């Protein structure tokens, strides 16, 4: 019997930075395992990834990216950009296409400029202003498409990202709607917060 898991993660890029948001519910088949899991992982102090798919695969890829970022910094004396990291991850995923990592990842960061990318399990790479992954992504992307503006502030983008994840949580049984993890990355660094809802 195939076990079903799910989540919703979103990313929004503005002129000021990048907002990543995700629900905090971990589910397995029809059971909620926890309501308090982090699905946005920092890779450097300026780049983070969202996780949708196999937890073990995501953790292995995150460790690889952390090591590559440290090696790049040591070798070249400057941080790896989010764009370079997205291309690196795309290559890693594509090299393993016969035994794929079962993940869908959003990379967001601000090193030289705000960058947002979406990667599929085979290494397909799309840079965009907004994106969503996971089982609730059809609901989240509708909210993002309706509310996104190129001139949004980071605060407006944060509110939109939370609304997109929360909307997905109300319609997708595998996405939680009680708490949303939010990471904002700007030229000033990375900030994480959790937005909780009582209802």
Curated annotation (Swiss-Prot):
This enzyme's EC code(s): 3.4.25.1
Keyword Hydrolase set for record: yes
GO terms, biological process: proteasome-mediated ubiquitin-dependent protein catabolic process
Assembly and binders: The 20S proteasome core is composed of 14 alpha and 14 beta subunits that assemble into four stacked heptameric rings, resulting in a barrel-shaped structure. The two inner rings, each composed of seven catalytic beta subunits, are sandwiched by two outer rings, each composed of seven alpha subunits. The catalytic chamber with the active sites is on the inside of the barrel. Has a gated structure, the ends of the cylinder being occluded by the N-termini of the alpha-subunits. Is capped at one or both ends by the proteasome regulatory ATPase, PAN.
Main location: cytoplasm
UniProt keyword annotation of Nucleotide-binding present: no
Pfam families: Proteasome
Cellular component terms per the entry's GO annotation: cytosol; proteasome core complex, beta-subunit complex
Family indicated by similarity: Belongs to the peptidase T1B family.
Catalysed reaction equations from the record: Cleavage of peptide bonds with very broad specificity
Ways its activity is controlled: The formation of the proteasomal ATPase PAN-20S proteasome complex, via the docking of the C-termini of PAN into the intersubunit pockets in the alpha-rings, triggers opening of the gate for substrate entry. Interconversion between the open-gate and close-gate conformations leads to a dynamic regulation of the 20S proteasome proteolysis activity.
Active-site residues annotated for this sequence: 7 (nucleophile)
Entry superkingdom: Archaea
Subcellular location: Cytoplasm
Propeptide regions on this chain: 1-6
Endpoints of the signal sequence: none
Protein's name in the database: Proteasome subunit beta 2
Top EC category: hydrolase
Function comment: Component of the proteasome core, a large protease complex with broad specificity involved in protein degradation.
Molecular function per GO: endopeptidase activity; threonine-type endopeptidase activity
PROSITE patterns on file: PROTEASOME_BETA_2 (PS51476)
Keywords attached to this entry: Autocatalytic cleavage, Cytoplasm, Hydrolase, Protease, Proteasome, Threonine protease, Zymogen
